[in-house]
Amino acid sequence: MKQGDRQTVMDIHEILKYLPHRYPLILVDRVVSLESGKRIHAYKNVSINEPYFSGHFPHHPVMPGVLIIEALAQAAALLTIRSENMEKDNGQVYYFVGIDAVRFKKPVIAGDQLVLKVEITRQLKGIWKYAACAEVDGQVVTEAQLMCTARAI
């Protein structure tokens, strides 16, 4: 699938088929590469119209770090759901269950494009571990080790 001159593996319509999140908490706009069982690269376009900017902070709007982490966790979910061929409405929910070694290196502001990079580092007994980083203009702004699981509901 092509959008403009950029390769698109999943557009927002396909992303919404896999993730239960909806506005204002859908934080992945496009997946540009996905290597099944290994890694994903995705984008989150940060607009001044994001609802959190009016309060964080009114005179110097900065994307909350917790939402950068959530964007990375959503990218991790897409990677695992696609890698494991999980069906939508399969009676399971994909949960974010842990985080280690998180670092916020630079603020993310309106107009930035977050490049979300997530790699599976381990999978054992229904628990996935990931190395994740978010970049803006080729510079790391956030990095973390994430842990997620799928559980029956």
From Swiss-Prot:
Q: Which Pfam families match?
A: FabA (PF07977)
Task: List the GO terms this entry assigns under cellular component, sorted alphabetically.
Answer: cytoplasm; membrane
| Residues annotated as the enzyme's active site | 56
EC code(s) of this entry: 4.2.1.59
| GO biological process: one example | lipid A biosynthetic process
Record carries keyword rRNA-binding: no
* Compartments where located: Cytoplasm
Q: Where in the sequence is the signal peptide annotated?
A: none
> So which domain of life are we looking at?
Bacteria
Which reaction(s) are listed as its catalytic activity? a (3R)-hydroxyacyl-[ACP] = a (2E)-enoyl-[ACP] + H2O
**Listed CDD domains:** FabZ (cd01288)
Q: Name one GO molecular function term.
A: (3R)-hydroxyacyl-[acyl-carrier-protein] dehydratase activity
Q: Which UniProt keywords apply?
A: Cytoplasm, Lipid A biosynthesis, Lipid biosynthesis, Lipid metabolism, Lyase
Entries under NCBIfam families matching the protein? fabZ, PRK00006.1
State the family it belongs to.
Answer: Belongs to the thioester dehydratase family. FabZ subfamily.
Function description: Involved in unsaturated fatty acids biosynthesis. Catalyzes the dehydration of short chain beta-hydroxyacyl-ACPs and long chain saturated and unsaturated beta-hydroxyacyl-ACPs.
- What's the protein called, per UniProt? 3-hydroxyacyl-[acyl-carrier-protein] dehydratase FabZ
Taxonomic lineage of the native organism: Bacteria, Pseudomonadati, Pseudomonadota, Betaproteobacteria, Nitrosomonadales
Q: Gene for this protein?
A: fabZ
